[in-house]
Amino acid sequence: MKNYQRLKGLIAASFTPMDAQGKINLSAINKYADLMAKSDLTGVFVCGTTGESQSLTTNERKNILEQWIKSSNGRFKVIAHIGSNSQVEAVELARHAAEIG
């Protein structure tokens, strides 16, 4: 069983960066993560309502979470929003989040 810790400090609700055509800009997350790390945050909440979760596909949400974890480089916690109108998708997102950390 995992050892869970109580969260303390500021958790930012991140937006999902997109280009002019409305496609997700994963590379922008690197700069965004650097800014968050400099802001002395405890963590970021990824793909919540501020992050456009309801307008993204399950695969897009997975890719965004993976990029945030990579970009955070252990400097802050990354918390995944796994909610969905589909129970199957919510379970898939939860499993994915657990698998990648």
Where are these regions (language model features)?
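Active-site beta->alpha loop and helix N-cap motifs at the rims of alpha/beta catalytic domains
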Residues: 2-12, 17-101
